[in-house]
């Protein structure tokens, strides 16, 4: 018994479409799952809001190392200074950005987004240069997911 041969086809399944939201959009992002982001025209895969937040800050910092160094040494009266420290033990949750520069990451998603807006303003970066790709079909399974 013989079967029909496979037909030649150029069909490719459509790529999954994600909701795109830029940093300058007025939308609450808490509870949304991020799968990737585009910063300065380059797309990056990501597993969490924390990862995106720290990678974007690293890129901003690499362009101008003076600002985060200033914040790390400033007193708490300086806006954003409570987000940056020289010691990883100062925060309950932090990520290393550079030598002796740590960013507080134990915050809610929307708080991170609001901080990015402030950092973009200080770095004179256009907020439309950061676009989030959201996949809400993943759903929210745990408290940890919500905080990410």
Residue ranges of each PLM-predicted region?
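Phosphate/dinucleotide-binding and metal-coordinating scaffold of catalytic cores
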Residues: 5
């Amino acid at each position: 018994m013989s079967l029909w041969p496979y037909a030649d086809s150029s069909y490719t399944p459509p790529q999954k479409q994600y909701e795109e939201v830029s940093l300058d959009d007025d939308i609450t992002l808490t509870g949304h799952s991020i799968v990737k982001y585009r910063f300065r025209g380059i797309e990056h895969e990501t597993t969490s809001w924390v990862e995106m937040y720290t990678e974007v800050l690293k890129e901003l910092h690499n362009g101008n190392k003076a600002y985060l160094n200033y914040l790390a040494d400033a007193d708490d009266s300086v806006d954003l200074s409570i987000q940056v420290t020289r010691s990883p033990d100062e925060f309950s949750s932090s990520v290393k950005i550079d030598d002796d520069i740590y960013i507080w990451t134990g915050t809610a998603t929307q708080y991170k987004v609001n901080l990015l807006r402030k950092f973009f303003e200080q770095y004179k970066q256009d907020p439309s240069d950061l676009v989030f790709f959201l996949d809400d079909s993943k759903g929210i399974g745990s408290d940890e997911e919500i905080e990410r």
